[in-house]
Curated annotation (Swiss-Prot):
Source organism: Thermus thermophilus (strain ATCC 27634 / DSM 579 / HB8)
Highest taxon of source: Bacteria
Region Interaction with tRNA, annotated ranges: 432-447
Protein name, per record: Glutamate--tRNA ligase
Matches recorded under HAMAP family: Glu_tRNA_synth_type1
Cellular component GO terms, alphabetical: cytosol
Site (Interaction with tRNA): L354
Catalytic activity: tRNA(Glu) + L-glutamate + ATP = L-glutamyl-tRNA(Glu) + AMP + diphosphate
């Protein structure tokens, strides 16, 4: 059975890069009827942020990436937080010492700094401490770490399913720390032990981990375990081709949610970052992605995360993929956040229908449609000028509107066209000042539709205010 996992660190906001990698892990597991695990790598206590784990899990659920095992859903391989698995790592580090694949190193931070300055990195000097002496010093409580003893000379072969075989000279592989002096493991030890114990068959992660993979391959060899298949995905990039980072881009999934991006659209866009559909189409469901998924269609070029392209896709989902009822339902939290209410479900649906071609994110709806929900809306300078130009015509139009009994789009259009013809002016010379009076803007849906939606009483009240 295919078993995949993601192992985010709770060190900040849920990252768009985590979602991208999660998506491919999820798809590969589902494509093969396998299992998808979420494990929390919280061993870096200095960078740990309270509440970050909950936000990561909530973001995955928001994106529709359900997992079979994890810290909040449990499973047969728990616990799923590395901080709750410390005795395991200590046990396996001891195992490596016994097998001659690791050694204790007692250098102080100051000594290590000096070694780095002189040698450019750790030189393995603690390898020469006789094991009995090292054990005695450890028993006395002398602070130390446990390091991997890389076999030298020699080579280590890494097979990446996307990139082929890479052979590393063991002289280039450092004796990395496996267990820190506080008893916490480093990424290398914890990730290999957990992947093995959790039955992970396919490790799908970002390409920045490729350089660490020879260390992991050596650890599998040291324990006598079969290594999983490795796939290193290209990193998401900024438009300037640098690695995506919060300095240059919005990387927090919480930001996309708050800005009114749809989870379906963001998910679809992230699929396109590393994958192309056989028929070349850009809009597809998660289920369609899973059905079409093969590694042959995964690109290794550095995918550029372009916010404008995502906005375009989000707009396509609002206009063409979701039903009118779904869009109306999803704008509600954004209306409430803007302090706006709606008089009925039918009114809200019609407002969304009119505005649908004009907003690309859910958050833009209350910004652009404010005048449909409140009397407290801004008036643009252009609209104010147009209103002032058209006041004489509006004064004459007002009694006609007041006397109009049939308040429908067709009847109102007939009235306004007839009025413009009678006055010998173009329709726009009447319609634009009236639009400004009713909405505070010159960029709105059709005027007759707005008049009909606002209703006679509210439309007349706004016109009276403009004429006062």
């Amino acid at each position: 059975m295919v078993v995949t996992r993601i192992a985010p660190s709770p060190t900040g906001d849920p990252h768009v890069g985590t979602a991208y990698i999660a998506l491919f892990n999820y798809a590969w597991a589902r494509r093969n009827g396998g299992r998808f695990i979420v494990r929390i790598e919280d061993t870096d206590r200095a960078r740990y942020v309270p509440g970050a784990e909950e936000r990561i899990l909530a973001a995955l659920k928001w994106l529709g990436l359900s997992y079979d095992e994890g810290p909040d859903v449990g499973g047969p391989h728990g616990p799923y937080r590395q901080s709750e698995r410390l005795p395991l790592y200590q046990k396996y580090a001891e195992e490596l010492l016994k097998r001659g694949w690791a050694y204790r190193a007692f250098e102080t931070p100051e000594e290590l700094e000096q070694i780095r300055k002189e040698k450019g990195g750790y030189d393995g000097r603690a390898r020469n401490i006789p094991p009995e002496e090292a054990e005695e010093r450890a028993r006395r409580g002398e602070p130390h770490v446990i390091r991997l003893k890389v076999p030298r000379p020699g080579t280590t072969e890494v097979k990446d399913e996307l990139r082929g075989v890479v052979v590393y000279d063991n002289q280039e592989i450092p004796d990395v720390v496996l267990l820190k002096s506080d008893g916490y493991p480093t990424y290398h030890l914890a990730n290999v032990v957990d992947d093995h114990l959790m039955g992970v068959t396919d490790v799908i992660r970002a390409e920045e981990w490729l350089v660490s993979t020879p260390i992991h391959v050596l650890l599998y060899r040291a324990f006598g375990w079969e290594a999983p298949r490795f796939y290193h995905m290209p990193l998401l990039r900024n438009p300037d081709k640098t690695k995506i980072s919060k300095r240059k881009s919005h990387t927090s999934l919480d930001w996309y949610k708050a800005e009114g991006f749809l989870p379906e659209a963001l998910r679809n866009y992230l699929c396109l970052m590393g994958f192309s559909m056989p028929d070349g189409r850009e809009i597809f469901t998660l289920e369609e992605f899973i059905q079409a998924f093969t590694w042959e269609r995964v690109s290794l070029g550095g995918p550029v995360f372009d916010l404008e392209k995502l906005r375009w896709m989000n707009g396509k989902y609002i206009r063409e993929v979701l039903s009118l009822e779904e869009v109306a339902e999803r704008v509600k939290p954004f209306l409430r956040e803007a302090g706006l209410s709606w008089e009925s479900e039918a009114y809200l649906r019609r407002a969304v229908e009119l505005m649908r071609p004009r907003f690309d994110t859910l958050k833009e709806f209350p910004e652009k449609a404010r005048y449909l929900f409140t009397e407290d809306y801004p008036v643009s300078e252009k609209a104010q000028r147009k209103l002032e130009e058209g006041l004489p015509l509006l004064k004459e139009l007002y009694p006609r509107l007041r006397a109009q009994e049939e308040w429908t789009e067709a009847a109102l259009e007939a009235l306004l066209r007839g009025f413009a013809a009678e006055k010998g002016v173009k329709l726009g010379q009447v319609a634009q000042p009236l639009r400004a009076a009713l909405t505070g803007s010159l960029e709105t849906p059709g005027l007759f539709e707005i008049l009909a939606l606002l209703g006679k009483e509210r439309a007349l009240r706004r016109l009276e205010r403009a004429l006062a």
